[in-house]
Amino acid sequence: AITYRSRPIFYSLQMPWENDWLNGPATEAACARILSLIGVQATAIRATEGGCCGWSVVVAIKKRAGEGKNAISALLSLPVVKQVIVTDDDIDIGNPDEVEWAVTFRCQADKDVVVLSGLKGKHVDPSVRPWDLKPGELPTTAKFGIDATIPEGIPAFRYERIVPAFADSVAPRDYL
């Protein structure tokens, strides 16, 4: 039978991918486990929504020398993780502005960005161009990590965030 509606709703969005939200805790648990195995003390781990709760991870650590990049290497070894940002534990990784601030002011791209090429990829990642692969061919990808921790040998106070006086008591909407 052919049916129709007099006032149909055309659903043109992609499905909500409930599995992405369900993957978040599992990804965070896998990250916690691998960091524990290499002796890095994570204080917070977040699989971000923008990275479909698995492809992109932000981690705050209690850092010792070399641990920022060690954490990046370990986390990028996880099959689905493609992008990692590691910060010190003074950064609220649930606040994208604080994470961006840490990347902007605690990172030098030539020293603190790690790029690994030729790693195993996933067919669902359009950046690996799965449509160009031959049947049975596995995709490879590049993954990267950003070490947004305070560099070793520099006092932490040099990297403290400066908050303008009275910033909490002023509401911009009062002046618009």
Model-derived regions: residue spans:
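Charged, compositionally biased interaction regions
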Residues: 1-176
